[in-house]
Amino acid sequence: MSARTTQLRNTVQTIHRCKAVHVKSVPVIEMFWQKVAWDGVVEVFRLAGHPKAKRCYAWSYTEGKETRFVTVLEVPPVESAQTAVRAAIASEAKK
């Protein structure tokens, strides 16, 4: 497992207080108004001990000099890496 994936797994476990096992990496390109809103790799984790979700999607990005981590639980309407990215973008847009 790469250092990035390990760091994301640790972030998922800390935030969601459950065990996370890496399942796969999924490339995602999310378009918005015919422009790329996000292009990267989403890590998929199987969760053990979480009361609401069996999976979590996680990724990181750089903002300025800081690395930011994003985790999105697989609860409706989130059902894939693609919909996790959409949900995160929508959540940020509301802020």
Give the location of each predicted region:
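Mixed-charge, Lys/Arg-enriched low-complexity segments
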Residues: 1-15, 64-95
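Acidic, low-complexity, intrinsically disordered interaction modules
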Residues: 21-79
